[in-house]
């Protein structure tokens, strides 16, 4: 951040934001543009004062925990799991998301400013999965399902533009679809095993 001129924006004009989003290309690399854009916005409002960066990191982590809660809750409400888990879906989702949020493994992702990239990828990863589930299980109009599907696609792109480990998202959605939405079928167990092994 200190030595990267691409994030040292003077205002929030389209030209300056474009510089931060694509400026890394001038170094011969194009990587994590959405993360660099967030650093640029941070720099615009607070310069190199670390407080603002830590505040944004903490906020992103909290939002990720919220969407993880929503994802788990929606999962436990699926027809395949509802009979066994719907009664305790809220408490299970809350406990699981809280344990994830306070787990020591996330300390560096929250406290190290540059590790915001990992937190942003996690946030948009959870968002993409949540919107996918909503799109697949929504009982509303076709338009509602399309909106959720578009939100899933946008979140997926933002996750990949935050950090490359989000490239595993399609595999996660595939396994989620065949195991939790369509449901495990004994006659297809070898196909499921092969898919899991591939992931």
What do the predicted segments below correspond to?
Residues 1-199:
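Polytopic membrane enzymes that build or remodel cell-surface glycoconjugates and lipids
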């Amino acid at each position: 951040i200190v030595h990267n001129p691409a994030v040292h924006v003077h205002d929030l004009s389209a030209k300056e934001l474009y510089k931060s989003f694509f400026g890394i290309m001038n170094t011969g690399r194009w990587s994590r543009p959405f993360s660099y854009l967030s650093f640029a916005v941070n720099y615009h409002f607070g310069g190199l004062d670390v407080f603002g960066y830590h505040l944004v990191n903490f906020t992103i982590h909290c939002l990720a925990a919220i969407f993880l809660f929503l994802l788990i809750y929606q999962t436990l409400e699926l027809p395949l799991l509802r009979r066994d888990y719907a009664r305790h879906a809220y408490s299970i989702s809350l406990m699981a998301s809280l344990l994830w949020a306070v787990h020591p493994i996330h300390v560096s992702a929250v406290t190290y400013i540059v590790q915001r990239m990992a937190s942003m990828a996690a946030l948009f990863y959870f968002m993409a999965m949540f919107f996918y589930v909503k799109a697949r299980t929504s009982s509303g109009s076709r338009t509602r399902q399309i909106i959720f599907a578009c939100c899933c696609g946008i979140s997926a792109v933002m996750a990949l533009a935050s950090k490359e480990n989000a490239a595993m998202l399609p595999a996660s959605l595939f396994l989620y679809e065949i195991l939790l939405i369509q449901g495990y079928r004994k006659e297809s167990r070898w196909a499921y095993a092969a898919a899991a092994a591939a992931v």
